[in-house]
């Protein structure tokens, strides 16, 4: 709960315009009033403060001289202070650009700041041993992100979960790219179709349609509307975080429906990021990425106009004594008993 003036700032939207060395600021006041004046101050340790003025209902453009990029190697952030009447907010932004372009050989690649950038990431389901989905403290979130970076990863795919915004802040300042999943929802799906048959078909390149809603657990129109609403809310909530570079709409057919329509809706909300429309199995040919999940078969890739990404693989497990909550049960797509063999397989 926060005490605010009668007329106060409701929403702040910040969009970096990388190729223009500028940032666009859009401010919304709680009463929906247009043409209300506000002041903007942009600061950074490498420059003198930049001051300008804007009005609600109109984009406010701020040019950034001697612009410094944001990347995992150099996660540079600019601070911004905005004052409207008796209300003020502080935030930050970064100058970075994510897109798909062809490289010099005509192969579609993900570009970060106008250069091809290989993303090597982990799937993070956000579980904690004591709080389940609730992190115990700020330091625990920092530790996870920093440890992944120390191990050589530059991306985390946040899987079927929205974290507290503090987590995304740490990704912003530490320098960790984020692929953000939408929370799936829907009713219970048919495992024989969504899991077993889909896995068997993955290597055939036969495109299964997303119209069998009763098999995917998404036959309820109310649930479809709820998903659309929550997808929009997720994008709006996380829009200002520079670390977030990809929206993942559906995962492995769980509650999947109207994939092309949902992709168009997500693009209307945010055209500055990439979209992985269907991560694994039920690809509908839309979005920026052909997203492959391959746990069991030799990798078989066909040329695509989109980026081809191996977005799930591995799942190897080696139980370490006294480091498991359940000593008897262990999950993995391949279970190892000896550390040496496991290390060799991971290397290869």
Predicted regions and their residues:
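Substrate-binding/catalytic cleft of secreted carbohydrate-active enzymes
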Residues: 145, 155-348
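Secreted/periplasmic carbohydrate-active enzymes, especially glycoside hydrolases
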Residues: 1-170, 174-178, 245-246, 265-268
